[in-house]
């Protein structure tokens, strides 16, 4: 008899909301030369192919910095830098184009693979490259001629979208042509950023050696706002050693993400190119695995609507089955939905509570407090309590009370005091379930 893996089934079920959310969305994936050189590169390509098979429109922008350095060193060519940009002269341009071209063909070959017993089995991807980017020279700055180092002049947005709509993966590199028929070496971060902005992409995704941005305790920072990124970049500018390419690579992505975020790209993600499956875990799991840069938090506390009933029902049902919450039918939820507040994360209901006012006694009950098991370490229950207190005060409520069988100590920590049944409003007192023997706790507002 075959052993069935419940973990696999659970993973599929948990990822389903994200599969639906990402389908049809445009994501610009920035794959640096460091990621391509890593042994995990084949797995990253498989994950990008998986994104495509799940209905995501993928634009893949690759860099070639370490490969260019390697081929220049091999041919004893030295290219100086000015303000962090490589000066690509006539003699080194051919080598730069060679390195970038080899990577483009290597990526295309990987995406074209469909061998049995591999993650790419059965895939038939169309990978499209072309003159979607028109470049121009950077020119001369402070007397320094950038030669064949350039910047973007325009992007063929219509052409890229047409290829995406036809089901192709669009592959862009750091070499682009100009209207004069010349080739210029561009910063891949700038290509990815401008493409994401012009396409109005839903996400910009980059790779780094670590699991995103790591804090002083060694933990990945799940979410950063633009102001956080600005401070972080300034700190890295002072602390990065001149030869620390990993630090500079991460800093370049943060600058790109900051620019993209402020130009309207909702989210940018930074994940590890060393960790197998990091891209999939970041996009298709509850908490992700890397760092995302957002204009506004992915979580928000808001008034529940009729569309949230399914999410609330799924959240509270396990607690009802355990006897922690009083059972509520779907019909009751529909009738009382205006009394509910939820915590919404990417369209998922991860927390809820309800507020039942008794205006004559100037009292209100906070009930049906539930937090998703994956999110019980983030003080979300406290956030719901603060929100309920604010709502109650606006209604002119003087006392907020709860009935609980399991969370007495937590509510006492928040300032609630235990009272007897007689302290309840008359209407609630008549409905008190003596068999359930819930503790009654009250807070003066």
Swiss-Prot record:
GO cellular component: cytoplasm
BP term (GO), one: L-arginine biosynthetic process
EC code(s) of this entry: 2.3.1.1
Coiled-coil features, chain-numbered ranges: none
Top-rank lineage group of the source organism: Bacteria
Residue ranges of domain N-acetyltransferase in the record: 299-445
Keywords in alphabetical order: Acyltransferase, Amino-acid biosynthesis, Arginine biosynthesis, Cytoplasm, Transferase
NCBIfam families in UniProt: N-Ac-Glu-synth, PRK05279.1
Name assigned to this protein: Amino-acid acetyltransferase
Naturally occurring in which organism (per UniProt): Vibrio cholerae serotype O1 (strain ATCC 39315 / El Tor Inaba N16961)
Lineage of source species: Bacteria, Pseudomonadati, Pseudomonadota, Gammaproteobacteria, Vibrionales
């Amino acid at each position: 008899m075959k052993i069935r893996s419940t973990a696999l089934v659970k993973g599929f079920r948990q990822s389903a909301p994200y599969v639906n959310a990402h389908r049809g969305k445009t994501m610009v994936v920035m794959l640096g030369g460091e990621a391509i050189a890593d042994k995990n590169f084949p797995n990253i390509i498989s994950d990008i192919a998986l994104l495509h098979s799940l209905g995501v429109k993928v634009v893949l922008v690759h860099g070639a910095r370490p490969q260019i350095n390697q081929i220049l060193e091999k041919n004893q060519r030295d290219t100086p830098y000015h303000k962090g940009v490589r000066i690509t002269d006539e003699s080194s341009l051919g080598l730069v184009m060679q390195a970038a071209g080899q990577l483009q063909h290597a990526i295309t070959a990987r995406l074209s693979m469909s061998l049995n017993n591999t993650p790419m089995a059965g895939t038939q991807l169309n990978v499209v490259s072309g003159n979607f980017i028109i470049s121009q020279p950077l020119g001369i700055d402070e007397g320094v001629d950038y030669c064949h180092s350039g910047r973007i002049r325009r992007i063929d947005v219509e052409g890229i979208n047409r290829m995406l709509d036809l089901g192709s993966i669009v592959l862009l590199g750091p070499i682009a042509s100009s209207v004069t028929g010349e080739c210029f070496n561009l910063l891949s971060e700038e290509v990815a950023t401008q493409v994401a902005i012009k396409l109005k992409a839903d996400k910009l995704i980059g790779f780094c050696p670590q699991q995103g941005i790591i804090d002083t305790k060694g933990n990945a920072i799940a979410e950063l706002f633009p102001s956080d990124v600005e401070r972080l970049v300034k700190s890295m500018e002072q602390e990065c050693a001149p030869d620390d390419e990993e630090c500079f690579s991460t800093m370049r992505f943060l600058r790109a993400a900051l620019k993209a975020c402020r130009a309207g790209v909702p989210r940018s993600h930074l994940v590890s190119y060393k960790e197998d499956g990091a891209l999939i875990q970041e996009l298709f799991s509850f908490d992700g695995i890397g760092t995302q840069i957002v204009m506004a938090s992915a979580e928000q506390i808001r008034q529940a609507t009729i569309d949230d009933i399914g999410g609330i029902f799924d959240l509270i049902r396990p607690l009802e089955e355990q006897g922690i919450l009083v059972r509520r039918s779907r019909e009751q939820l529909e009738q009382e939905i205006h009394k509910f507040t939820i915590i919404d994360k990417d369209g998922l209901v991860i927390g809820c509570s309800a507020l039942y006012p008794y205006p004559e006694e100037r009292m209100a009950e906070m009930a049906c407090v539930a937090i998703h098991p994956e999110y019980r370490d983030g003080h979300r229950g406290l956030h719901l309590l603060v929100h309920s207190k604010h709502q109650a005060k606006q209604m002119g409520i003087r006392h907020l009370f709860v009935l609980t069988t399991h969370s007495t100590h937590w509510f006492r920590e928040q300032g609630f005091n235990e009272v007897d049944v007689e302290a309840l409003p008359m209407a609630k007192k008549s409905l008190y379930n003596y068999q359930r023997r819930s503790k009654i706790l009250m807070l003066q507002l």
